[in-house]
């Protein structure tokens, strides 16, 4: 949000802290091989090159939110140019997939790859004292689900074509893929 300060400054500070406190080095993505048992791919889906995410709140403010969600689902949501990794990292990953011969392939991403949908009854989960902004967030998720969309476009749920490319690359190379991810709250 605008009151949190300049995005670039916050991102740069976060990246500096990440590198100073975690033993990951300067590389934003990397391969770790464990003999023929497994290969782990550490990727970046937050800071480097992903496409700008869409926000359900913007669609809710449209004159006809249901139409806005449907138009988004049938249009921008399916944009083949949309990416979580960026072209360079995605190319690197798919090349690594092609050369990987390990029994297990573990892909680490900063955001969930599974889709999450908000059920209509979710509004009943709140107490009467719950602030409206929280209820409105839930309404956004419900509106998205009614259009067949996941509630969060800021994770892989907002990048279905890019997500499909990852899974197709794993299938093409007959990998036993396990995805581990974070940032679920």
Which residues make up each language-model segment?
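Metal-dependent phosphoester/phosphodiester hydrolase catalytic core
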Residues: 1-185
